[in-house]
Amino acid sequence: MSAGQRFAFAICILEISLLRAGPTPSYDPAERQGTPLPIDCRMSSWSEWSKCDPCLKQMFRSRSIEIFGQFNGRKCVDAVGDRQQCVPTEACEDPEEGCGNDFQCGTGRCIKNRLLCNEDNDCGDYSDEDNCEQDPRPPCRNRVVEESELARTAGFGINILGMDPLSTPFDNQYYNGLCDRVWDGNTLTYYRRPWNVASLTYDTKADKNFRTENHEESIQILRTIIEEKKLNFNAGLSVKYTPVEAIEKNKCVDLEHSDKGSTSSPSKLAAEAKFRFTYSKDDIYRLLSSYSAKQEKMFLHVKGKVHLGRFVMRSRDVMLQTTFLDSINTLPTTYEKGEYFAFLETYGTHYSSSGSLGGLYELIYVLDKKSMEQKDIELRDVQRCLGFDLDLSLKVGVEVTGNFDSKLCSKKGMGQTETNPEADLFDDVITFIRGGTRKYATELKEKLLRGARMINVTDFVNWAASLNHAPVLISQKLVPIYDLIPVKMKDAHLKKQNLERAIEDYINEFSVRKCQPCQNGGTVVLLDGECVCSCPKEFKGVACEIKK
């Protein structure tokens, strides 16, 4: 397998989709009963084992989540599905196989004979390039052309509860013998358009201004993120980012630098030193929730975007990954919740039929209001010091320029904190960045670990320069994943119906309705199997039961 293939299989797109329904119920302050007892995760009993599937030689059972862990109780991390081997009592009706007059690859894929010996990996395993006695006939001949990172990420899916899909259904390194070149005026390069991508357009632009918002409460930022990233699904404030079903053969290389190993519990986060570095969704949302218990804080929310290009996927005759087709074939024809949930967690609940690629740059500064008052610093001063009130200019090669006012920073006592540990204006900075290379992420991580709290517009410029090498989806039109099931596949109609049902059950299984309400106007959020209360600024505690 080539490095490009490994990249296509491993790429993960960090698309957080937080979904909000109606208002969260809460206790009246007069009904406050004190700190509630911990609630442990409670699951139903296992169902009976299913009949032995004659083709899969497996049988299945499932269970449901009745109550999620809350108030420091045990969270729900166990699978809802189970399987075991069995000896079938019925014969398996194998579908007719074969490619007729076409060439059958080692992967089982059928391709036209004209695609043999052309130096392209049309089979996915290079078996079409074996036994070539004549000179190869490359489609692009002597024309200079590069593989497009934008095209290779096109079509990648999302999970409506926010988890990153572990694989893509599309084989975007299949070209069907064509050499369709697309010119990128920014990198001055011709890129080859894959067969699955009907349209690929390079059009680089950046937001002229940063968007900045300030909030008095952390829940306001959480709601802002939800409103901007939610989809029109009735899923409530529920987020799930850890797969727990049977997907043992899939592994993910996270191109957006999500450090899964750094996930921490709320108690551990509270005990850690300031200025932590994280791209982990777990840490981001738990950190925002933890600040609801602290007084005299203000939150500056900074957002910037760079758009590199657009794509539209082909609507018919797409070339799907062999692993995706194998996964569909191994789905049982009877509805087994655990198996279908596992499929959704592997490939996503939806895929992108069209969209934009680039990067999103988002920072949340936690400011100390008392320190600002003592130094006579206003929010506008902070924005000017960091450079986030300036217009940006974009040049060829995705070069973004901008400057920050270092003289103003020094005058106001907001000097660079790597050399000025007394500058306690910035309590923390929480990064929420999508796109860009690992090299940039490492540099930013090292800067934050040295104690630098003033991540400024220069850091944005450095990040933007790396986007050509690692773009991500920044907007997309979504289509249910079951629409990709080939109509000629055995039991296609049954499995499509089962997947449609599974998406609805998936939302209901991981629903915030299985949480207990918070007290005193607190908002309950379901974070990866645990219900967490985000409190108004006047209250704190696991249930917002304590008045500050």
Swiss-Prot record:
Q: Which residues form the TSP type-1 domain?
A: 40-93
Keyword Glycoprotein on this protein? Answer: yes
Where in the numbering of this chain does the LDL-receptor class A domain appear? Answer: 97-134
Carbohydrate-modified residues are: 456
Q: What is this protein called?
A: Complement component C9
User: Which gene is annotated as encoding this protein in its UniProt record?
Assistant: C9
Q: What does this protein do?
A: Pore-forming component of the membrane attack complex (MAC), a multiprotein complex activated by the complement cascade, which inserts into a target cell membrane and forms a pore, leading to target cell membrane rupture and cell lysis. The MAC is initiated by proteolytic cleavage of C5 into complement C5b in response to the classical, alternative, lectin and GZMK complement pathways. The complement pathways consist in a cascade of proteins that leads to phagocytosis and breakdown of pathogens and signaling that strengthens the adaptive immune system.
Where does this protein come from, organism-wise?
Bos taurus
Q: Domain MACPF spans what residues?
A: 136-514
The entry describes its oligomerization and partners as: Homooligomer; about 20 C9 chains oligomerize to give rise to a huge beta-barrel that forms a 100 Angstrom diameter pore in target membranes. Component of the membrane attack complex (MAC), composed of complement C5b, C6, C7, C8A, C8B, C8G and multiple copies of the pore-forming subunit C9.
Compartments in which it is found: Secreted; Target cell membrane
The record's similarity note reads:
Belongs to the complement C6/C7/C8/C9 family.
Name its GO BP terms in alphabetical order.
cell killing; complement activation; complement activation, alternative pathway; complement activation, classical pathway; killing of cells of another organism; protein homooligomerization
Top-level lineage group: Eukaryota
